[in-house]
From Swiss-Prot:
SUPFAM superfamilies: Translational machinery components. InterPro entries: Ribosomal_uL18_bac-type, Ribosomal_uL18_bac/euk. This is Large ribosomal subunit protein uL18. Belongs to the universal ribosomal protein uL18 family. Part of the 50S ribosomal subunit; part of the 5S rRNA/L5/L18/L25 subcomplex. Contacts the 5S and 23S rRNAs.
Length: 117
């Protein structure tokens, strides 16, 4: 089993637990160049809010989209959008990535912005 398959296996287990609780989830995806985050409805069918380091407004502010500073900016932006929609509690879906570095920076910024998980 290679690294990607292991990550996908971990993600599948996490998503199954979140689906069983029927919680709104904050899903992330990390690449070398950018980080993406979405708030997905409890049924898993609708993206309610999204933010990424590749968005036009953030791209101008960031020198590089693959840094912890970029991840923190994405987390803060997503928390603002969620507050606008009245979402305060979510389940954090780290998509099998380690809770370290950019993933942790995004999560902490989202918490500071008012999201609870």
């Amino acid at each position: 089993m290679n690294t990607k398959q292991s990550r996908i296996r971990r993600a599948r287990k996490t998503r199954a637990k979140i689906a069983a609780v029927k919680a709104i989830r904050l899903a992330i995806h990390r690449t070398n160049s950018h980080i993406y985050a979405q708030i997905i409805s409890a049924d898993g069918g609708t993206v309610m809010a999204s933010a990424s380091s590749n968005d036009k407004d953030l791209r101008g502010q960031l020198a590089n989209g693959g840094t912890t500073a970029a991840a923190a900016a994405v987390g803060k932006r997503l928390a603002e959008k969620a507050k606008g929609l009245g979402i305060e509690k979510v389940a954090f879906d780290r998509a099998g990535f380690k809770f370290h570095g950019r993933v942790k920076a995004l999560a902490e910024a989202a918490r500071e912005g008012g999201l609870a998980f």
